[in-house]
Design a protein with these regions (language model features):
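Long, intrinsically disordered, low-complexity segments
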Residues: 20-21, 52, 76, 106-107, ...
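Flexible, polar/acidic helix-loop-strand segments at domain edges
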Residues: 327-411, 578-582
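An aromatic- and glycine-enriched ligand-binding surface/loop that stacks and positions planar moieties
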Residues: 21-80, 190-193, 209-368, 496, ...
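TPR-repeat structural position
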Residues: 182, 229, 429-430
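Conserved, well-structured interaction surfaces
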Residues: 40-59, 81-153, 172-180, 189-202, ...
Length: 582
């Protein structure tokens, strides 16, 4: 879906707030105001386009909004040791402006959504099918905004009625509680589920848009953030059963990380961020909602942060040695490497000769004696996922907002693994949970798990899901940071120790050592070794609310990261103990 550029001023930007009259006035269409805009379906459809465009900005998903969570997880480390470093080290100060960009851009999204939702009214029964789709999409996108704001900043301001801030004073809201924020997220997704069509019923219209399947998937995710496993399981079962349309795993895992109509918005995707294919883009990088351009590239820069320096990338982020070794530790039933490794980490492996595009890095052949690293000063395993490192599209990184690969934010494999997790939480290890996991493993050619190996041990099956199945399936994607928070891994001594081990990496300019295993036990003995989680400060599993934002709003206070306060007393359930799977 191509998202056309609409002027932010026309689409009710933050600086043009005013009260609205619901009556239609005859006015000059070229001189729209907040009093005349939004009184018909056509103008509200333009607002929908604007909202979708906002989720493609720097602070939402085009770069920082995506990669901050990737940094927070234990599958990725900051190989530049400059850009993102305080966020990777989980000790970002509240004066770091980068941390404000997601806050800024998600509230732009919320503003446009609020305007449209308010225009639609509260009584859904009187809405036409077109208006239901408009309101449903905006509820989904507002829910998505608050999902991200709550997961990042813990206590965001909740603004859900456009009329309540039609004056400037109404903008200075107070913090919500964590529970209040998740309540709002759940409410928005739940209502969106009732208004939107399925991907099947929506047909061509549904391509690239939010559907009831997307809303259901995110509703389950939101429920799981507070350990509402029984409720989430019911929703996930409905998705699997086809209530919200047909979804299935793509036969080729790599099809989830390529651009083009043959791969994007496929049968596995519940929701993805739409970007224009390379070669069809404009020339202007549109980083923020205030520098819009009719000739915007409409691409993302996640690839720029992941890309190796030798290939023109910014060389900022690398895959963790733990993730690489996890892939190498289990072969397929035919004795080969897990094919997901090829699409996740850009290493040379003899087995990749003849597989897909072979041993290439941006069409440049790789050899065993000339490995590619992310950063020439600090090394690092290059991240292949959501880049063109393995797609054969071009021979070097095109930096800036030029990557055209749609970011698949929720896939059917996530539904299956979450259903297995919830089933395990509710009923303990069952054959049903194992079967759902095995669907994902079978796509990769791995052997089936056996219930007998987990019988009566929910902690062991959780370990398998959390630290084997999910990292292999979703390694280096957005979401791992959210998982670590909801699982309580920062609040348990053995789990914190575990993520310190997972987060250990080597800083070296010796490219021959890039694939070596590392040991947390040697941190402090070997100056090249470091673990990001050693520098974690209590409360900084969330990101601090920017001090400039606090200065502008006297009603707003900092969160646990601003105050360096522990959240251990705010858990929604016990933390699973570490279980040795070997």
């Amino acid at each position: 879906m191509k998202l056309h550029k609409i002027s932010l001023a026309v689409l009710v930007g933050l600086g043009t707030l005013a009260s609205c009259d619901s009556k239609l006035d005859v006015s000059n269409p070229n001189q729209q105001t907040t009093a005349t805009f939004g009184n018909d379906v056509e103008s509200l459809e333009e607002n929908v386009i604007a909202a979708y465009n906002h989720i493609r900005m720097e602070g939402t998903y085009a770069r920082v909004g995506y990669t901050l969570d990737v940094c927070r997880g234990d599958e990725v480390w900051n190989s530049s040791q400059v850009w993102y470093m305080p966020f990777d080290d989980l000790n970002a100060p509240f004066t770091d402006e980068i941390g404000q960009w997601s806050w800024r851009d998600w509230y732009y999204t919320i503003n446009v959504c609020n305007y449209t939702i308010t225009r639609c009214g509260e009584d859904n029964s009187v809405l036409s099918e077109t208006m239901k789709r408009i309101k449903g999409q905006m509820l989904f996108l507002r829910g998505l905004a608050y999902y991200n704001l709550t997961g990042y900043y813990q206590n965001p301001i909740l603004i859900s009625d456009y009329n309540t801030y039609s004056t400037l004073d109404g903008l200075y809201g107070t913090n919500s509680t964590y529970d209040e924020a998740w309540d709002q997220v759940e409410k928005d997704f739940a209502e969106a589920m009732t208004l939107l069509p399925s991907r099947d019923a929506g047909g061509q219209w549904a391509l690239g848009r939010a559907t009831n399947g997307a809303a259901a998937g995110y509703y389950a995710r939101a429920l799981m953030m507070r350990h509402k496993y029984s409720e989430a399981l019911a929703v996930l079962k409905d998705i699997i059963g086809g209530k919200y349309g047909h979804y299935e795993l793509m036969k080729n895992y790599g099809d989830n990380f390529r651009e083009g109509s043959a791969y994007e918005n496929n049968a596995e995707s519940l929701f993805e961020i739409q970007y224009l294919d390379y070669g069809s883009q404009g020339t202007d990088d549109e980083w923020t909602p205030v520098n819009t351009s009719p000739n915007a590239t409409q691409g993302h820069a996640v690839e720029s942060n992941f890309g190796p320096g030798d290939m023109g990338g910014w060389a900022d982020l690398s895959a963790s040695p733990w993730l690489y070794q996890l892939f190498k530790s289990e072969k397929t039933t035919s004795g080969s490497l897990d094919p997901r490794l090829y699409w996740t980490i850009g290493t040379y492996e003899p087995e990749w000769d003849g597989f897909e595009y072979g041993n290439v890095c941006y069409t440049v052949p790789m050899t065993a004696d000339a490995p590619v690293v992310t950063n020439n000063n600090n090394g690092g395993l290059p991240i292949a996922k959501n880049t063109n490192l393995r797609t054969g599209l071009y021979d070097k990184v095109v930096t800036g907002l030029h990557c055209g690969i749609n970011l698949r934010m929720m896939r059917y494999s996530d539904v299956l693994l979450r259903a297995a997790e919830c089933e395990n939480e509710v009923n303990g290890p069952t054959q049903q949970a194992i079967d759902w996991i095995n669907q994902v493993r079978n796509r990769a050619g791995l052997a089936d798990l056996k219930l007998a190996d987990f019988s009566g041990n929910a902690d062991k099956l959780f370990e398998q899901i959390a630290n084997v199945e999910r990292p292999k399936e979703f390694g280096c994607e957005f979401g791992r940071g959210f998982d670590l928070v909801r699982w309580g891994f920062f609040y348990s001594a053995d789990r914190l120790q575990q993520i310190k081990e997972h987060g250990t990496f080597r800083r070296t300019n010796d490219k021959t050592r890039v694939k070596e295993p590392v040991s947390y036990a040697e941190v402090g003995l070997d100056p090249e070794l470091k673990s990001s989680y050693d520098s974690w400060i209590q409360g900084h599993e969330f990101f601090p609310i920017y001090q400039g934002t606090l200065n502008d709003n006297p009603n707003l206070v900092g969160n646990s990261a601003n105050k360096s306060e522990s959240n251990a007393d705010k858990l929604y359930g016990p933390v699973h103990p570490v279980v040795n799977l070997k």
